[in-house]
Amino acid sequence: SPLTYGGEQENSLVPGTYNSPACAGFAAALHELGNKDAQHLKNLYGHFVMRAREFDFIRVNTFGEHSPHIINITFDGYLGENVLHYLEEFGIYTSQGSACSSHSKKKSRALEALGADKRTADCSLRISFDFENTIAEIDEFFKVCTQIPQNLIRCYK
């Protein structure tokens, strides 16, 4: 027999009255965490873009309205797949193309919408941030990128 009765409004699964103050407190906490995380992601994005400007072979493709946790960049002249594997050697994991086309060998629709040609799409990587990422990790990414011209062959001039 059940320990408590009632809850017909919840298919007899949740008897009793909701703890409205606890629900409101939980919602406020989630909202606060969301704002804090969103600001952190925006800070990471801004730092990434600032650092990318230091490199003549790295171009940021993400402009206008965008998710602050995703950035698409082109390594001018270097195949994205080669850069991806090079970064993996240092424990840096990225993706090629856009999330919309991650399982497709065709040119990314998202990059195409940005006006990217095949060469740009071939040389692009997608970087995703998490609220646990740090500025120091972005700096490490660019430290590794300084070695790309010495270690990878340019496929495009």
Predicted region positions:
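Pyridoxal 5′-phosphate
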Residues: S1-K157
